[in-house]
Amino acid sequence: MIQSHVSVMLNEMLEALSPKAGESYLDCTFGAGGYSKAILESCNCYVTALDRDPNVIKRAEEIQQNYGERFDFVETNFADSFAKLKEKKFDGIVLDLGVSSMQLDIADRGFSFLHDGPLDMRMSGQGLSAEEFVNAAEEKELADVIYKYGDESFSRRIAKRIVEYRKTARIDSTGKLAEIVRSSIGFRKGKIDPATKTFQAIRIYVNDELGELEQFLVNVKNILKKDGRLVVVSFHSLEDRIVKNFFKENSEKPVVRSKYAKDDMTIDPNKWLKIITNKALAPSDKEVGLNIRARSAKLRAAKAIYE
């Protein structure tokens, strides 16, 4: 059963995407369908949604029943979507890089340190699981992954404790891993759960989330129409840095050759984006108060000025 999910920065996403009737949009991270539904309700437009999680298919079918041919769903991760989308181009593309409540709140999915379940964390159910990684990786690799993808300053201490624990028993549940992490660094008053960063790091690693994001951005120009908008909502500094650098590297203000000829400008055709959000947008205090999972969200948007 899919749990209730609250889409993060929904209004800001719609404002940045600016959907128009008759146009086509790509929701690269369907999840519980919050973004897709909001775009479809905003005007008489079309949405193609992607997700590698087979558990969302039922929700996609529900939306398709309501919106008919205006909605289409493709089961794939966004990095591998280009072949399945063939030569289709879109007027706008949106990515919500966060983990949905339907993944976090269902214990059997193995994402949550709050709900005990099998230590899995795979979004597609395929490939290396968190259990396999945690029980097989060398101490240094564990520490490096937890530090790099979780920005966890206690990564070495946590990795050492994991290796010590698995000498006596296999770490096969989220509850076990969470307790190992907590016992390594302890609770700090007013701080997030000590297991938060470690679980984030392992999830990012086993799903190759950053690699998929980088691969998608390299190819996104091929599916975004001229004047089409790219909107990305990220949830931690590594994702945001990738998006920020991509926007910066692919956008450039026109250079005026002469102060007397303002229309005489040279433009690098490889700089195909115009940044819409000069700085990353953050959720309002009100939204964070209603949905604590929004606290780390950042939204960046850009527009294609060339195809």
From Swiss-Prot:
Signal peptide: none annotated. It is an enzyme of class 2 (transferase). PANTHER family: 12S RRNA N4-METHYLCYTIDINE METHYLTRANSFERASE, S-ADENOSYL-METHYLTRANSFERASE MRAW. It is found in: Cytoplasm. Specifically methylates the N4 position of cytidine in position 1402 (C1402) of 16S rRNA. NCBIfam families: 16S rRNA (cytosine(1402)-N(4))-methyltransferase RsmH (TIGR00006). It catalyses: cytidine(1402) in 16S rRNA + S-adenosyl-L-methionine = N(4)-methylcytidine(1402) in 16S rRNA + S-adenosyl-L-homocysteine + H(+). It comes from Rickettsia rickettsii (strain Sheila Smith). One of its GO terms (biological process) is rRNA base methylation. Its main location: cytoplasm. GO terms for cellular component: cytoplasm. The gene is rsmH. S-adenosyl-L-methionine binds at residues 33-35, 51, 82, 96, 103. This is Ribosomal RNA small subunit methyltransferase H. Belongs to the methyltransferase superfamily. RsmH family. Its EC number is 2.1.1.199. Pfam families: Methyltransf_5. Keywords: Cytoplasm, Methyltransferase, rRNA processing, S-adenosyl-L-methionine, Transferase. One of its GO terms (molecular function) is rRNA (cytosine-N4-)-methyltransferase activity. Gene3D superfamilies: Putative methyltransferase TM0872, insert domain, Vaccinia Virus protein VP39.
